[in-house]
Amino acid sequence: MPPTKIFTSTKTRFMALIACVAIVAAACGSDVNTSSTATEPPPSPSNPKTITLVTHESFALSEDVLAAFTAETGITVELLTSGDAGTALNQSILSAGNPLGDVIFGIDNTLMSRALEANILDAYESPLLAEIPDEFKLDDTHRLLPVSVGDVCLNYDVGYFTDNGIAPPQSLGDLTDPALKGLLVVQNPATSSPGLAFLLASIAEFGFDGDYTWKSFWADLRANGVRVSPGWTEAYYGDFTWAGGGDRPIVVSYASSPPAEVFFAEPRPAAAPTAVVEASCFRQQEFVGILSGTNETAAAQMFVDFLLGVDAQNDIPWNMFVFPVNSLATPPPEFVEFSLIPDNPLSVPSVAIEASREGWIEDWTDIVVR
């Protein structure tokens, strides 16, 4: 008998090529910071400002798009990258009241409740929210505003499995097969947002009841030689056979990673060299917020508007390999062609993540790495 699932995956659809997901809105505290109104003239080419964006190392936009923003507003954006989104959030919480920057990007729906509970963000109801479907607006206090959406999934090296005559995994449960021993690398959920998303995917899939639970699954993965890397970059560009020349042909990455492998290849192949295990996918949204304590509130708000606007949104797919959320944006046809769009991505309600995330991570640590 299959194990009882505490959470079930829900059928989703794309609206205007954008994934729309129904996730319960995160519970929010009553103490909400409000961005102060600037008393000095707003930023402009004649009144230039510099702001710092705290983000993960995968943040990217085209130079010409950022340059156009600077030319129009007089705002220069400096990046302070902190590895993974989980690390960026941890550092921002530790520096509360004396923020490392002015704006933070990369907090996702798995980390949202933690960021809101820490009360490190100012509220800002951007006028650009009117162009974003309600499905993506998970924070009704407007401290975290939606920017992108994608799916965290198992990726595998197609050539490795073909050359070695091994069947690639088709489900999470397949990862415990002795035939796949020593082939998987994941990220630590304590420090990595895709790592946390994959942990939540296992909880959604295997649940807590019955003879086989999510804890059983991870115990079996440990016995089957799973490797744990600190973050996505180390796993994908270090351990993964295709991208990093490592010895692990299965990695936790994104549904949009295969089109990235096509886009950057010279010459471009007819088919992607990597593939996605659709049954493993967990829906992920990323958000932007203004850090409390910034001295550049007006400039920070203008940058948030820029990220939510069509110019930046159209630039997101081929730079960060996720889908935009603005309903007026148009993802490139080639990006859509090579991206797998899961029919039934796994999900865990935000309220459950908020209540149990730290305990789940602690249990995972006890099972997998201690």
Describe the predicted segments one by one:
Residues 99-104, 122-158, 173, 182-189:
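A structural signal for short loop-to-beta-strand junctions that line the ligand-binding cleft
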Residues 28-29, 38-114, 370:
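Early extracytoplasmic/lumenal segment of secretory-pathway proteins
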Residues 109-120, 139-167, 195-205, 283-289:
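Periplasmic solute-binding protein
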Residues 194-279:
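Ligand-binding pocket segment of bilobal, Venus flytrap-like solute-binding proteins
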Residues 1-50:
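Short, low-complexity disordered leader/linker segments with a strong preference
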Residues 121-130, 144-145, 173-176, 255, ...:
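Short beta-strand->loop
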Residues 333-370:
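Extracellular/periplasmic bilobal clamshell ligand-binding domains
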Residues 282, 291-347:
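Mature extracytoplasmic/periplasmic domains
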